């Protein structure tokens, strides 16, 4: 903002001084200032708002000072406009009028009523039902020689609050996993914002905070105060010093943004990396777990195929499950057994789906109720959702799955609060508090009495109307109401001469006159007093109900977690049965056996007349790397991805697309697939490729699964082949991970002769007289042809280009390459006209030297000397 409040105070209007005082407290926020029926922004904020919302930038008079820029929008549309600003990365402060302007003595009193940032919002206009919205804090600390990174992330709409204590180099993977909307950094670490901008979407906001907020003492005090405890040992986070500081920063920031009703955030949990697999950005992207590489949407992703959830809580948890596969066999097996039971018991599964579908978003409803942002209809929905729990509990309490039984036994049916909501909120309640009438009759005696007074008084109005019609002989006389004039008698202009003297005129219209009388005034006072008191009492009762619901936060959140997990297991069962998946066996060993595996996404999008071709995959102690060669478009990349996805599905506890599968537990899945430039970071295709390859070699273990596709494609042939060869040797000799390596370097097939652990496989083709058919079947043995020309033909290359490519390929294979040149070539292809030989420079020199020899005039000694020269030339000495 290009204005200094201190310097302007004398000449600004009182309202602008009020504005500037508020703006001074929130300089980094867009300030929306309520003026009448509009929210206005001024100065530099106005320019930003005008540009972001594409609304008119105008000017406002400012007393003796110069006119100032102004942009605004109607107050009733504020939620949509604020959502647009926040989605564009702005942080917004809302300053409202907190008294009736007509009752104000002088300047209307205004206060900050809301602060909205990308990471702190409850608005449905901003949030996605199926996505978490995380606020995240990062803290980098050093104790002695140990350097640690703390990550804390919270979704204020669901009360999920977690921390992770990491090595600094692990932070990027964590951020890419949680995908926060806003990140809090210390001023000391603000340079890390450059890293954030490289690894996260552009709209993620980085907020820099004062360094003192990142002290251990400050953080501990904030956490202990929030959770009302004197020690953090009971939370299991006492030793995670950097993560604990990050958690304190999150809570401090929420307080700074006026989030002062956070009683519903009742838990904080430590993320244990030993329990879950870490998926880096490349793996998530290359396997298309959550989104498609084509357009970034869920269409074409694993999530789209697997997601059969019935409510938003389950949908959000399913995303988290897919991004955090399990590494504990007992947890995996518990999910698999539950899915098996739900598949076998179709009637139970159907009834469960009906129950889950009737449950609304308990987590987000609770957060809005606890912060007094909720409306009566949402409270009613929460109550009706709780009413579904007994049926779900009864349905699964005798289940054949221990996990399902344990889950439903943990449900708290909350009979008392459910009954209170049922008796308090009218089923026909309006969407807004101002609509009134949402508290049921019989819930509160005082409210019933006030409503009776109002109702009886309104009946009295009808009696007055009938009496006045008789007295005046005006049959069209009506008693009506509006907010400006209150109750009045309306008489048409044609009948105005019949109006008696005791009528007091209130308003003149084009076609009518409006009056009042003493009796009407008395009733008006009774009605308005009763209505006003009734409305105030309703709001008070509703607020008290919200407080009572908030007191049950722990129980409601526990129910929400259970419902979400049941929903995910139900989703697994639905897709597993529908798609013919099988229950995998997950073991502690390092083997892997998949019989007739299928790609879970590709098989769903292929045409009916083009069935997906299944393939086997096998690893044991002896066979650790499958070197897959074969033509382009023959299915090598799909084969790699399908096996990665099958392993991932098994370890998230879902059945898998195969005839049978035994999965040796995998600690991480690494992928290096395709080529992509990171030009915004100044990184070429090859550098990106090498960075990703280095990450794999440095972090993979003997329990990992590595998927490599076309390593070395971003550089020269010999460089690329050398790197691919060396990587293969290193993985087998040092790392020992199960590896699928798809390559167009057919020379790598020779590695099978050097390593017992490497086996050659190829994607089969059938050659006919005029074309090649890709069978997409992976079989034992190496391939010696990539059939690139056939792929070019399928892509629609002109037939002349295809024919010429075949001739050039034939020549190259014979080391006798001939390319036509000259003006005669324009528009025509003449394979045998005017030829030149293309040799490497050394070969050209050798050829010229041989052609220059005149063997008819040489003596035997001359011939030997010339032969020696040719040897030197061939050896590079010439």
Curated annotation (Swiss-Prot):
CDD domains per the UniProt record, alphabetical: ABC_MutS1
Keyword set, alphabetical order: ATP-binding, DNA damage, DNA repair, DNA-binding, Nucleotide-binding
Gene Ontology BP annotations: mismatch repair
Residue stretches in coiled coil: none
GO cellular component, one term: cytosol
One Pfam family here: MutS_IV
Family: Belongs to the DNA mismatch repair MutS family.
Name of this protein: DNA mismatch repair protein MutS
Species, as recorded: Chlorobium phaeobacteroides (strain BS1)
Gene: mutS
């Amino acid at each position: 903002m290009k204005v200094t409040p201190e310097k302007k105070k004398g000449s600004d209007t009182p309202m602008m001084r009020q504005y500037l005082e508020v703006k001074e407290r929130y300089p980094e926020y867009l300030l929306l200032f309520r003026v009448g029926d509009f929210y206005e922004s001024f100065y530099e904020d106005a320019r930003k708002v005008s540009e972001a919302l594409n609304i008119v930038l105008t000017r406002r008079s400012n007393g003796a000072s110069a006119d100032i820029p102004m942009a605004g929008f109607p107050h009733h549309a504020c939620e949509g406009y604020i959502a647009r600003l926040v989605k564009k990365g702005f942080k917004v402060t809302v300053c409202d009028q907190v008294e009736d302007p007509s009752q104000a003595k002088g300047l209307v009193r205004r206060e900050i009523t809301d602060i909205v940032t990308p990471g702190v919002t409850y608005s449905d206009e901003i949030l996605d039902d199926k996505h978490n919205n995380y606020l995240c804090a990062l803290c980098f600390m050093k104790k002695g020689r140990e350097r640690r990174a703390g990550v804390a992330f919270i979704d204020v709409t669901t009360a999920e609050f977690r921390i992770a204590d990491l090595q600094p180099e692990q932070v990027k993977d964590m951020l890419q996993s949680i995908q926060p909307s806003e990140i809090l950094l210390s001023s000391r670490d603000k340079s890390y914002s450059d890293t954030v901008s490289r690894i996260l979407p552009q709209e993620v906001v980085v907020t820099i905070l004062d360094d003192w907020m990142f002290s251990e003492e400050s953080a501990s005090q904030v956490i202990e105060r929030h959770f009302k405890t004197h020690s953090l040992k009971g939370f299991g986070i006492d030793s995670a010093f950097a993560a604990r500081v990050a958690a304190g920063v999150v809570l401090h920031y929420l307080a700074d943004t006026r989030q002062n009703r956070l009683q519903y955030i009742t838990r904080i949990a430590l993320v244990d990396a030993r329990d879950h697999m870490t998926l880096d950005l490349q793996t998530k992207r290359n396997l298309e777990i959550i989104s498609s590489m084509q357009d970034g949407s869920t269409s074409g992703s694993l999530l789209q195929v697997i997601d059969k959830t019935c409510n938003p809580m389950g949908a959000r948890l399913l995303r988290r499950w897919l991004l955090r596969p399990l590494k504990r066999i007992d947890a995996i097996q518990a999910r698999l057994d539950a899915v098996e039971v739900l598949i076998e018991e179709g009637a139970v599964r159907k009834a469960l789906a009906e129950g889950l579908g009737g449950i609304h978003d308990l987590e987000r409803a609770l957060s809005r109720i606890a912060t007094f942002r909720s409306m009566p209809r949402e409270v009613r929905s929460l109550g009706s959702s709780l009413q579904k729990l007994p049926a779900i509990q009864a349905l699964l309490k005798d289940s054949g799955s221990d996990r399902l039984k344990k889950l439903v036994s943990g449900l708290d049916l909350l009979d008392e609060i459910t009954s209170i909501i049922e008796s308090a909120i009218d089923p026909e309640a309006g969407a807004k508090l101002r609509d009134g009438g949402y508290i049921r009759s019989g819930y509160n005696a005082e409210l019933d009495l006030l409503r009776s007074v109002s109702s009886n008084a309104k009946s009295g109005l009808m009696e007055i109307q009938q009496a006045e019609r008789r007295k005046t002989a005006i049959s069209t006389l009506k008693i009506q109401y509006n907010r400006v004039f209150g109750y009045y008698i309306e008489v048409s202009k044609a009948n105005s001469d019949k109006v008696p003297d005791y009528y007091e005129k209130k308003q003149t219209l084009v076609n009518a006159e409006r009056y009042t009388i003493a009796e009407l005034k008395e009733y008006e006072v009774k009605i308005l007093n009763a209505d006003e008191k009734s409305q105030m009492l309703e709001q008070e009762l509703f607020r008290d109900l919200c407080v009572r619901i908030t007191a049950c936060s722990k129980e409601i959140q526990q129910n929400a977690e259970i419902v979400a997990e049941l929903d995910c297991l139900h989703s697994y069962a639905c897709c597993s049965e529908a798609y013919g998946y099988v229950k995998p066996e997950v073991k502690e060993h390092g083997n892997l056996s998949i019989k007739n595996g299928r790609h879970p996404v590709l098989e769903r999008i292929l045409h009916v007349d083009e069935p997906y071709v299944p393939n086997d995959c096998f690893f044991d102690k002896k066979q650790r790397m499958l070197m897959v060669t074969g033509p382009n478009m023959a299915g090598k990349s799909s084969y790699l991805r399908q096996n990665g996805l099958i392993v991932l599905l098994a370890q998230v506890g879902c059945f898998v697309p195969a005839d049978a599968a035994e999965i040796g537990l995998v600690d991480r899945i690494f992928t290096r697939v395709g080529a992509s430039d990171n030009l915004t970071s100044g990184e070429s295709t090859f550098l990106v490729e090498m960075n990703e390859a280095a990450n794999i070699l440095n972090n993979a273990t003997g329990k990992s699964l590595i998927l490599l596709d076309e390593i070395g494609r971003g550089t020269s042939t010999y460089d690329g082949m050398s790197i691919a060869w060396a990587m293969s040797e290193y993985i087998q000799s040092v790392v020992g991970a199960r590896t699928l390596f798809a390559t167009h370097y057919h020379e790598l097939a020779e590695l099978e002769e050097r390593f017992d652990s490497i086996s050659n496989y190829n994607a089969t083709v059938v050659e006919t007289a005029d074309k090649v058919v890709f069978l997409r079947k992976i079989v034992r043995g190496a391939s010696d042809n990539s059939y690139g020309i056939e792929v070019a033909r399928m892509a629609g290359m002109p037939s002349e280009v295809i024919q010429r490519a075949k001739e050039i390929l034939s020549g190259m294979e014979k080391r006798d390459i001939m390319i036509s040149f000259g003006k005669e070539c324009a528009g025509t292809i003449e394979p045998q006209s005017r030829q030149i030989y293309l040799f490497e420079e050394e070969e050209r020199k050798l050829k010229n030297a041989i052609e220059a020899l005149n063997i008819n005039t040489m003596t035997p000694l001359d011939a030997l000397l010339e032969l020696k020269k040719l040897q030197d030339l061939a050896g590079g000495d010439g």
